[in-house]
Amino acid sequence: MAAALVLRTWSRAAGQLICVRYFQTCGNVHVLKPKYVCFFGYPPFKYSHPYQWLKTTAALQGQIVQFKLSDIGEGIREVTVKEWYVKEGDTVSQFDSICEVQSDKASVTITSRYDGVIKKLYYNLDDTAYVGKPLVDIETEALKDSEEDVVETPAVSHDEHTHQEIKGQKTLATPAVRRLAMENNIKLSEVIGSGKDGRILKEDILNYLEKQTGAILPPSPKAEIMPPPPKPKDRTIPIPISKPPVFIGKDRTEPVKGFHKAMVKTMSAALKIPHFGYCDEVDLTELVKLREELKPIAFARGIKLSFMPFFLKAASLGLLQFPILNASVDENCQNITYKASHNIGIAMDTEQGLIVPNVKNVQIRSIFEIATELNRLQKLGSAGQLSTNDLIGGTFTLSNIGSIGGTYAKPVILPPEVAIGALGTIKALPRFNEKGEVCKAQIMNVSWSADHRIIDGATVSRFSNLWKSYLENPAFMLLDLK
């Protein structure tokens, strides 16, 4: 099968130069291998068509495209390159991961919008990349079809199986999709595309393959089966282990970036807020018992149940009674916005620094649903893979500093929020019961901070007392759950 590009017309009396490009067949695949042959006179092949003048162009052209860092949103103008998933010379397809970048709010994976070959990386690891500037150069491969005076030709029969398109139509598909069809011996002309303008997508190939052959697609990943919880052991006092020094040697200077840069902005803004502090202790004896009863049930559902879901739900119930604590103020403190959703943030310590993802809509979630979301956020936070959506939109914050150590803290408000709580370590301490007898109690201290410009001390105290009552008597939460 051949397509001819006639560079000049010729007369039957005088031969002119003709350049011919052949499409050679390799197995079941058409591979474009240009072979330029010069003839004087008529070409040595015959057109299987009654018309004499056939002008067709088929050419593969490579183009270097500067792949620029697009706007990530949230006013982010610069990011830090944390990891490259490609190197120069690698072949990429659309939606393949190019690199991972980190802003002062979240880590984002950048994906390719082109099929082609990576020609240049503009940044090294830990370099600062700017929105709108080139990230990589990609040499694209686009089949450029320009037809003049197109005349349909009869289909050419081959002994070998070939992928031929419907006459007069062009099948839209990326090279990756064509490769998938080729590997599974599928004619693209028989597949109905679901993409724009009938473009054939990868899903269309997989669906076609499943219908034709009954192929079983790879199963979706199942929930990881957690090992049975270990039996509780006698509590022993841990012996401090001295670790080798983290840093020795000469002084060095490095720029503040990533989450540390976000902390600079947030804490500088928080310094302008007059903080009101309030501390109290909470007896969690009954909650500790309840959690031990619910842990096996949560484990059967694949959920790791900590105390935090109870703390968040109790806080949400309290915010329903004191909505001023779930509000925000503008920069000049002229307007108060009361938030309908309780998006409660959790201060999380990671290798990348302090991050505060939030659980969305705590007011409509159950304890188990909150625990499931916390498990997800903690897993992504440890891997540095939290999305921007996980980190924005917070309305109230709890900091579980007690998981590391400490009894009291002085939490700093995260603008534009107006309140935050810090939770201390749960300790077994002697306390008096209602009969005046000394008994063992599970005590946790809590420290609150509120924006004293719009929140008075009495409001914080009443909120804390209500939150405390829910945790000291977990059954009370059932009365107010909706």
Swiss-Prot record:
GO CC annotation terms, alphabetical: cytoplasm; mitochondrial matrix; mitochondrion
Biased composition (Pro residues): 218-230
Keywords: Acetylation, Acyltransferase, Lipoyl, Mitochondrion, Phosphoprotein, Transferase, Transit peptide
Molecular functions (GO terms): acetyltransferase activity; dihydrolipoyllysine-residue (2-methylpropanoyl)transferase activity; lipoic acid binding
Catalytic activity entry: N(6)-[(R)-dihydrolipoyl]-L-lysyl-[protein] + 2-methylpropanoyl-CoA = N(6)-[(R)-S(8)-2-methylpropanoyldihydrolipoyl]-L-lysyl-[protein] + CoA
Residues annotated as catalytic: 452, 456
Residues of the Lipoyl-binding domain: 64-139
One Pfam family, short name: 2-oxoacid_dh
Cofactor note: Binds 1 lipoyl cofactor covalently.
Subunit comment: Forms a 24-polypeptide structural core with octahedral symmetry that represents the E2 component of the branched-chain alpha-ketoacid dehydrogenase (BCKDH) complex. The BCKDH complex is composed of three major building blocks E1, E2 and E3. It is organized around E2, a 24-meric cubic core composed of DBT, to which are associated 6 to 12 copies of E1, and approximately 6 copies of the dehydrogenase E3, a DLD dimer.
Assigned protein family: Belongs to the 2-oxoacid dehydrogenase family.
Protein name as catalogued: Lipoamide acyltransferase component of branched-chain alpha-keto acid dehydrogenase complex, mitochondrial
Native organism: Bos taurus
